[in-house]
C-alpha cells in the first residue's frame, strides 16, 4: 500500500501541465520525485488557534526580548493572513513599552488596521479591547495622533 502511494506521488512529481492543461512527462524527474513522495504521505501536526496565541504571547512576554527580536516578531506576525488576537497585540505593546519603543507601538496598531482590510468592524473592536492597556501604558492610537489623515 505504501509503495502504491509512493508511485502515485512519484508520477505526480514527474508530470506537468502543458499550455492546454494536458499532463506531460517531466523532462528529468531528478530528486524532486523523492521529495514529493515524502510530502504526499506525511502528516504534520497542526497548531490550534489557542496554541498559536499562546506561542506569540509567550514570545512577546519574554523578559529579555530585545529590539531586534521585537521587530522580527512583529514582521513575522504581519506576514500571516490574519488579524492577531487582542491578547497578542497586548503582549507586543507591553514589550514595546519595556523597550521604550513608541514607534513600534504605532506601527503595530497601523498594521492591525491594515490587516483588517475592508472589514471595518475589526479595528474598532481591537482598539476597544486594548483600550485599558493603551491607557495604562500611555499609548496613543494613530487616529489620536492624526496619522490617519496623512
UniProtKB/Swiss-Prot annotation:
The modification N6-acetyllysine is found at residues 87, 113. Pathway: Energy metabolism; oxidative phosphorylation. Keywords: Acetylation, Heme, Iron, Membrane, Metal-binding, Mitochondrion, Mitochondrion inner membrane, Phosphoprotein, Transit peptide, Ubl conjugation. The modification Phosphothreonine is found at residue 141. The keyword Heme applies. It is found in: Mitochondrion inner membrane. InterPro entries: Cyt_c_oxidase_su5A/6, Cyt_c_oxidase_su5A/6_sf. In response to mitochondrial stress, the precursor protein is ubiquitinated by the SIFI complex in the cytoplasm before mitochondrial import, leading to its degradation. Within the SIFI complex, UBR4 initiates ubiquitin chain that are further elongated or branched by KCMF1. A motif (SIFI-degron) lies at residues 2-17. One of its GO terms (biological process) is mitochondrial electron transport, cytochrome c to oxygen. GO terms for cellular component: mitochondrial inner membrane; respiratory chain complex IV. It is a peripheral membrane protein. Residues 1-41 form a transit peptide. GO terms for molecular function: metal ion binding. PANTHER family: CYTOCHROME C OXIDASE POLYPEPTIDE, CYTOCHROME C OXIDASE SUBUNIT 5A, MITOCHONDRIAL. Component of the cytochrome c oxidase, the last enzyme in the mitochondrial electron transport chain which drives oxidative phosphorylation. The respiratory chain contains 3 multisubunit complexes succinate dehydrogenase (complex II, CII), ubiquinol-cytochrome c oxidoreductase (cytochrome b-c1 complex, complex III, CIII) and cytochrome c oxidase (complex IV, CIV), that cooperate to transfer electrons derived from NADH and succinate to molecular oxygen, creating an electrochemical gradient over the inner membrane that drives transmembrane transport and the ATP synthase. Component of the cytochrome c oxidase (complex IV, CIV), a multisubunit enzyme composed of 14 subunits. The complex is composed of a catalytic core of 3 subunits MT-CO1, MT-CO2 and MT-CO3, encoded in the mitochondrial DNA, and 11 supernumerary subunits COX4I, COX5A, COX5B, COX6A, COX6B, COX6C, COX7A, COX7B, COX7C, COX8 and NDUFA4, which are encoded in the nuclear genome. Belongs to the cytochrome c oxidase subunit 5A family. This is Cytochrome c oxidase subunit 5A, mitochondrial. It comes from Papio anubis (Olive baboon).
